[in-house]
Amino acid sequence: SDVYKRQVAACVAAAAVGPENVLGIAMPSRYSSQHSIDDAKYTAQALGIEFKIESIDGMHSNLESQIGEMLTAGSSVASENIQSRLRGIIVMAHANAQGRMAIATGNKSELAQGYCTLYGDMAGGYTPLGDLYKMQVYALADVFNKRALDFGLKAPISKSTLTKPCLLYTSDAADDP
């Protein structure tokens, strides 16, 4: 899933500015798995960061009622990108309201392929994983886990996160390249 890179980005943020200064937000939709939400919560608890769950379903339903015809015409990309953009709105609202820096979670593999959403997962003032290829992000996850375990702490990224299939949870069958 896409969860692993968000968890690694949270680890980078907590290491850079201290866990007391990091807010993690899970923003599930109708396509999100409970497992992904649980994994995000696990990481937040392991890192000691503030964590909120804010569903995008209400916003998504309202938008579908207003422009649903446009979202269902042709490719499913429009509908899938709307979900990412709604998440970007929530992240930026928190950043603006609380004087925080939003971070984007894209990696070099995604950015090189254009596999990202403008005003969605690209929303943020900094992209800490932007110079790392996807496999390097996985390696960094291992580094954060090993470091935590070496200090007698809980590994911040669960094994289930690192071993589950890469699904985007933006539709019933969307893959992450």
Locate the predicted segments by residue.
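Active-site adenylate/phosphate-handling loop in enzymes that bind or generate adenylated species
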Residues: 17-18, 72-150
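Short, glycine/charged-enriched secondary-structure capping and boundary segments
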Residues: 13, 38-40, 67, 116-120
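Structured core elements
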Residues: 8, 23-26, 50-55, 60, ...
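A phosphate-binding catalytic loop at a beta-strand-loop-alpha-helix junction
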Residues: 1-18
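Single conserved hydrophobic/aromatic residue that forms the stacking wall/gate
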Residues: 4, 169-177
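Solvent-exposed alpha-helical segments within well-ordered globular domains of core cellular machineries
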Residues: 10-11, 15, 38, 92-93
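A conserved beta-strand->alpha-helix junction
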Residues: 21-75, 84, 110, 156-165
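Mobile late-domain/C-terminal helix-loop "cap" segments
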Residues: 130, 149-171
